[in-house]
């Protein structure tokens, strides 16, 4: 039986050395956990992680995390702490350079993230901050027929005319506070209209509380003149800018 339904492959050597003290009702753990030469690929994630080296030191009610991994030829690191003394808390820092992201057939990209994550699982609070640089990417025009994605068990279907915020509040969603800056480098290309269109720009992405959609501020534009084929004609595209000042899916 698969470890998880959407896990394509998983490998590595996991070891633990430590001791247990305290009482049956209040055990205390101390020890070291190591993952050597780990790897994982999941159909739900656009990354295949390889060469995962992870070390965690568990000291009673707290654990530290130090790890490194590869995605393509890019290198990433993951550090942080997990504390479960009172209200459990997870604090992580993700850094990387030229990590390979691939969501076939729509996008292949290299990303350089610097992200901090703070999670309070019992309170359902999540804070996400940082920046993601995209020095290189190839974005393809989606096909006319979009592949079907199965609905997960926690999805709530919102019918037309229903109050989305009220439904979200009744479902007790996570309180998310996200602030991310995304910058496009000079090798980001959109492939469509029988042309390769170079893009450039920056977006500030944010989400607050029970908001139903991520918001964006910034602009993405064509960085140089190109020739495209659209509406049955060959056209010169001199200038095009998509400006964002609201819901991410609704640029102007």
Predicted regions mapped to residue ranges:
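Strand-loop-strand
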Residues: 6-17, 36-43, 47-252
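Short flexible loop/turn segments that cap and initiate beta-strands
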Residues: 27-33, 128
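Short acidic, glycine/proline-rich loop/turn micro-motifs
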Residues: 2-4
């Amino acid at each position: 039986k698969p470890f998880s339904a959407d896990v394509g492959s998983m490998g590595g050597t996991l070891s633990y050395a430590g001791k247990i003290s305290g009482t049956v009702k209040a055990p205390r753990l101390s020890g070291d956990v190591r993952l050597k030469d780990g790897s994982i690929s999941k159909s739900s994630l656009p990354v295949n992680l390889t060469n995962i080296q992870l070390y965690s030191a568990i000291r009673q009610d707290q654990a530290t995390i130090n790890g490194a991994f590869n995605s393509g030829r890019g290198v990433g690191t993951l550090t942080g702490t997990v504390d479960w003394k009172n209200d459990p808390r997870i604090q992580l820092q993700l850094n990387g350079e030229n990590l390979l992201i691939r969501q076939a057939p729509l996008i292949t990209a290299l990303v350089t993230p610097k992200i901090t994550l703070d999670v309070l699982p019992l309170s359902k609070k999540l804070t996400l901050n940082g920046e993601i640089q995209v020095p290189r990417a190839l974005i393809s025009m989606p096909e006319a027929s979009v592949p079907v994605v199965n609905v997960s068990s926690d999805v709530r279907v919102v019918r037309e005319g229903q109050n989305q915020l009220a439904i979200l509040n009744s479902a007790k969603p996570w309180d998310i506070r996200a602030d991310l800056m995304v910058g496009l480098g000079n090798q980001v290309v959109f492939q469509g209209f029988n042309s390769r269109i170079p893009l450039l720009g920056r977006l500030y992405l944010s989400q607050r509380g029970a908001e139903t959609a991520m918001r964006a501020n910034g602009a993405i534009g064509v960085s140089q003149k190109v020739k495209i084929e659209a509406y049955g004609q060959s056209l010169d595209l001199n200038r095009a800018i998509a400006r964002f000042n609201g819901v991410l899916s609704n640029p102007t």
